Amino acid sequence: MDAIRAQLDEFLGKDRNLLPKDRIKVENDFNDPDICKFFLCGLCPHELFTNANIRDLGPCSKLHDENCVKQYQNNKDKDKYDYEREWVRVIEGLISDNDKKIKRNKERLLQNPNGDANHHGGPIQQQSISQLDDEEGGLLPDKEQNSKITELDLKIQELLKKAEELGEEGQITEAQALMTEADELKNQKVELEKIEQEKNENKRMSVCEICGALLFVGDKEKRSISHLEGKKHIGFQKIREVMEEYYKSGRRANLGRTDFYNAPPPPRDSYRDDRRSSSSSYHDIDGRRDHRYGGGSRDYGGSDRRGGGNYNNGRGSSRDNYNNINNSRDYRNDHGKDYDRKRERDYYNDDDRRKRDRNY
């Protein structure tokens, strides 16, 4: 319903249900939440793969407004919206998944040049090939021979049934004539099955370099055209062409990597400084504990060096243990944070390593 509503809004406007006198001419802004940000960047993958089983993209529920595209492209501060980075992530993800599929199918065809490998690495039967073709826009095998074989099989069954009925009625001559006719049809069926089997054995398969569909090599021209006009093939060809032009423009290199290694080092945490100051004031000059911790000595018994009594009536030992545990935990946390910050700063200062990651 959302996709249908978005299409109606795109063609008729959001105020399509209002009377002409009540309609207000309002121009959409490219930053509106109901505007498709992928369309602003140049290509919406939902539009290419509608009703196609591509990572469950489905139809686009956003508006595709050409005026918003002009607004976005002419905006000097468009980079701050970060639409392009998300668009590149989605498009490159589609291409990467498709490249993996092409590589996987090629490896399986190398294992058996006749192409008998399915999605799980096992043999591809004729039925599974047809399923792949239906789903991915590949080439369907010749169904004309199969239909002839099916027709012959039905005629044979019909003749055998009539011959049996005539034999029960005592019409032996007529029954034998039908049996002879059925035997001739059986021979024709066997010949057709042999021809079909030889065709399947001689047919080699290949992988489409654009969409990854399994194809029969040297098949009929009309089937090749049907594959090239398939929705998946056209979709992947389009996004590959768009991304090739995008790479040539140099804008992809300006985006850099999206992980935290490419970000500047984070500011020093005030929490860390507070912990350091608190740890420095933990002991006074004489080595005694700070007054905030009860004024007792460092030993767990609680008596200080000047001969004072037990800390808080003998309860100092348990409190000291509790505070020591908390302090050790804080130290481990601070130490881990310091290590992470140092690792990020070292990486940020290493230009060669960052260049290698961006090229990768």
UniProtKB/Swiss-Prot annotation:
GO terms for molecular function: mRNA binding. InterPro entries: Luc7-rel. The keyword Membrane does not apply. Keywords: Coiled coil, mRNA processing, mRNA splicing, Nucleus. Residues 269-293, 329-360 have a biased composition (Basic and acidic residues). It comes from the Eukaryota. Residues 312-321 have a biased composition (Low complexity). It is found in: Nucleus. Residues 143-206 form a coiled coil. Pfam families: LUC7. Its main location: nucleus. Residues 255-360 are annotated as: Disordered. One of its GO terms (cellular component) is nucleus. GO terms for biological process: mRNA splice site recognition; RNA splicing. The keyword Nucleus applies. Transmembrane segments: none annotated. May play a role in RNA splicing. Belongs to the Luc7 family. This is Luc7-like protein. It comes from Dictyostelium discoideum.
